[in-house]
Design a protein with these regions (language model features):
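N-terminal active-site segment of His-dependent metallophosphoesterases
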Residues: 1-69, 75
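Residue-identity detector for glutamine
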Residues: 31, 42, 61, 104, ...
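A short, well-ordered alpha-helical element
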Residues: 31-42, 161-164, 279-284
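His/Asp/Glu-rich metal-coordinating catalytic cores
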Residues: 45, 56-67, 71, 75-239, ...
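C-terminal functional module detector
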Residues: 232-284
């Protein structure tokens, strides 16, 4: 039975609270998850659904953190399949990016659909050119997508047409998508409507989401693991992790794995009633 690990929002290289230690926390989470649930579970492949890096311009330390685990996976014979997120997507006027370079160097497979005047085209992965829009691994057909932002609803129509063209009943179809989804946010920004998402259902059996930094599932076929580490204090209280997914004759079983190295955050509160000066507060 095919088995894979679904991650998202690693944000390698993040510099939160100007703390070098917090930057390393994100590496330790990534490293521990890979050792426990990718190599330890002998998965067939790993999916990273966007925001592998925290920024387009990747610092040397972040690249070291990425390659350290990518090299372990490559040595174990476990392919890594990645899509761009809003943090690490390539610039429109520049055909180069660090994710594309890592793909060219053989550390990962970056999946990118082709958008032109005719709509969306999906190309099978070409191992010689190290590029493509979908790839077949262990009986699973994995489709990639771009970071569409607030236009994701409109982009989905053309993407669905392309998915229909490349559907194969012999393969288990998985789509990687980096987007917010309606009903999962605490802030009023445009998100992909669930009704629009449901239009994928005749072509896709598992949607591997990223972008929202908390775990959620929709109807047993849409999965968002959340970020591996908390990007701020508020996020610490969100449920998050990595999905270990097994595919069988009756579909798939996705289990959220949460036991791995993370920074513990303690929130403390103080009653300052009646303390009128900094000195009085300090004494209290």
């Amino acid at each position: 039975m095919p088995k894979f690990l679904h991650l998202a929002d690693l944000h390698l290289g993040i510099r939160r609270y100007r703390s070098e230690e917090r930057t390393r926390d994100f590496f330790f989470a990534w490293q521990d998850v890979i050792e426990r649930y990718a190599i330890g579970e002998q998965v067939d492949f790993v999916l990273i659904a966007g925001d592998f890096f925290d920024a387009r311009r990747v610092e040397p330390q972040a690249m070291n953190h990425a390659i350290a685990c990518l090299d372990r996976l490559r040595a174990a014979g476990i392919p890594v399949v990645v899509i761009e997120g809003n943090h690490d997507c390539h610039e429109a006027e520049n055909k180069f990016s660090w994710l594309r370079s890592l793909s060219q160097w053989g550390f990962l497979h970056l999946l990118e659909p082709i958008h032109d005047e005719g709509g969306v085209r999906l190309q099978r992965w070409n191992d010689a050119e190290r590029k493509g829009s979908f790839i077949d691994i262990a009986g699973v057909r994995i489709f990639g997508s771009l970071w569409y932002g607030s236009t994701v609803g409109q982009a989905l129509g053309s993407l669905i047409d392309a998915l229909r063209e490349h559907h194969d009943d012999r393969l288990y179809p998985v789509l990687m998508l980096h987007t917010d989804v309606e009903g999962q946010l605490n802030r009023p920004i445009p998100a992909l409507p669930v009704a629009r998402l449901n239009e994928l259902r005749s072509h896709i059996r598992y949607v591997a989401l990223g972008h929202t930094h908390k775990n959620f599932e929709i109807d047993g076929w849409v999965y968002n693991p959340g970020s591996l580490e908390a990007c701020n204090v508020e996020e610490y209280f969100n449920r998050r992790g990595a999905y270990l997914v097994e595919i069988g004759e009756d579909g798939h079983r996705a289990e959220l794995k949460r036991e791995y190295q993370q920074r513990r955050i303690v929130r403390q509160s103080f009653d300052v009633t009646g303390q009128e000066t900094p000195e009085a507060l300090h004494q209290a």
